[in-house]
Amino acid sequence: MAYFPGLNLLFIHVPKTAGNTVTSELIQYEPAQPPTKILLPGMDGLNRFELKDGFSEKKHANLRAYQATMPADLFKELTVVFVYRNPVDRLVSFFYSPHRSAERGDRVLGLREFFHLLRRHPTLDDYLGLDTPPFPRQLISLRFRSLDSDWTLLASRLGLGQVGSLPQYNASSVQGVRKTWPIFWLAMLATRHRLDFAYRLGCGFQTGLSSRRRLWPRKRLRL
């Protein structure tokens, strides 16, 4: 989503993983020229914006988009950061996101609708997978469930000094579907989204579903 040159950091904004929160904080600590923040007042929710960094024009750009536009010597030295959120919670949160209220109406998320989300929603591998070199220097995952503490660790690693707690923007609850969560989990395991769980387990992120996707060698750090 955004390149921070002074930090030598690329943040990939996976939807519904507190990306607005993290990028808002990173902008404050960027010692060089930060990405341009463009507010989106026409959208539902608070503090919705896009960032323009000269390499991608999309808020939720994937890693391949940056690989295609960045000089190779710059790309291969990057620290790539993303937030890992339980894949089921992430999709459920997307369904109930404030900006989808008109499309959703008063519908409650059921199994059929969840399968529809699985078919059209990108996987983590879609956002982070690479087929060919160059590859970034390292990949760091922040855990959504412990984002404050992981953010503090990342700030320490980047030499940002003492940082405060993260604010929360545009949260959508997943509590209303907790009873059906096991069914959604099984549904996800039946699709390509099952590979998202490997990012939490640190299993190498290999898809096993496509001969085109190959594991890109990287140093993965879990904070």
Regions found by a protein language model. Give the residues of each.
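Membrane-interface amphipathic segments in extracytoplasmic regions
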Residues: 1-223
